[in-house]
């Protein structure tokens, strides 16, 4: 509080040797039960039965009807999740904050979030996995167009009956309920927790305080967004049917002489600019064993 010229320069400033960490979204897929499978050569084929035989009733001396199972294939091929983080050598040498460890922890967390995002929202194709929320073979429900006021109105504002409807649609497909779970964001979590009976009693709050909804666990990720009009989305399903093929898990490498191009298209060289650059890589792919194990709901009005 002393004026610098009146002696303030003589009062040393104290810095705590800690840094306030960044607030991250939560990851959800592995917490809900997604499974890692090895992908040694960068690809993996998983045969699957798409249709079964059929048993019929018959009579004496009658021909037995022939039925034939059908088969398909799930193919995983490695896709690269990547990041490069440069730091100046002066920063690494001059700080007491263990800046290298801070950067490493941040990079690891970012890669975990990138994998989670790909599992939910990946667009598919050569360079991205296909996510549960975007896979056209996963059943999709639009909360705005249900034409059933007992479940949701035309704006997508859902009722307390809606989660029961979602659960029932998935279970009707004979889905294994061993790892069924919900994924939605904190805004929708709050909306569901605030649903009340006509007498003012909270319907789901006590159960949701234990981390479950209708008997199944839920996880919150704010990578699932809510737009400015209050619309958001959720997924419900058997997350054990979500396979993460892994050719190589997280690898980090730090160099003093690498080069890279930044987001603005400028070329950088670590040696010339006295930088240290840390690169992180994963080689993975993601697929659902059974597409019918999941249900995605969009256009839910959360506020």
Residue ranges and their predicted role:
Residues 181-185:
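Short, conserved beta-strand edge motifs with alternating hydrophobic and charged residues
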Residues 72-77, 101-108, 157, 187, ...:
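Sequence/fold signature of self-assembling virion shell proteins
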Residues 1-179, 193-205, 211, 218-220, ...:
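Acidic/polar, low-complexity extended loops/arms that serve as protein-protein interfaces
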């Amino acid at each position: 509080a002393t004026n610098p010229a009146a002696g303030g320069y003589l009062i040393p400033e104290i810095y705590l040797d800690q840094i306030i960490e960044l607030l991250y979204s939560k990851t959800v897929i592995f917490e809900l039960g997604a499974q890692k499978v090895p992908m040694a050569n960068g690809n993996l084929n998983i045969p699957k039965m798409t249709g079964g035989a059929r048993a019929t009733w018959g009579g004496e001396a009658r021909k037995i009807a022939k039925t034939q199972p059908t088969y398909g294939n799930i193919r995983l091929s490695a896709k690269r999740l990547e990041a490069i983080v440069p730091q100046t050598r002066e920063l690494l040498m001059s700080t007491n904050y263990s800046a290298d460890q801070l950067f490493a922890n941040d990079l690891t967390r970012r890669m975990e979030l990138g994998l989670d995002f790909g599992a939910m929202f990946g667009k598919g194709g050569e360079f991205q996995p296909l996510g549960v929320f975007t896979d056209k073979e996963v059943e999709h429900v639009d909360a705005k167009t249900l034409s059933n006021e007992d479940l949701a109105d035309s704006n997508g504002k859902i009722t307390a009956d809606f989660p029961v409807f979602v659960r029932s649609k998935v279970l009707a497909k004979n889905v294994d309920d061993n790892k069924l779970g919900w994924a939605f964001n904190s805004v929708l979590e709050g909306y569901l927790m605030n649903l009340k009976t006509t007498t003012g009693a909270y319907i789901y709050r006590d159960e949701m305080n234990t981390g479950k909804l209708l008997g199944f666990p839920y996880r919150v990720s704010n990578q699932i967004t809510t737009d400015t009009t209050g619309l958001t989305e959720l997924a419900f399903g058997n997350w054990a049917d979500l396979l993460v093929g892994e050719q190589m898990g997280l690898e980090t490498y730090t160099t003093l002489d690498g080069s890279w191009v930044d987001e603005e298209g400028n070329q950088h060289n670590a040696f010339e600019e006295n930088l240290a650059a840390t690169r992180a890589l994963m080689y993975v792919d993601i697929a659902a064993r059974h597409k019918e194990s999941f249900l995605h709901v969009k256009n839910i009005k959360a506020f």
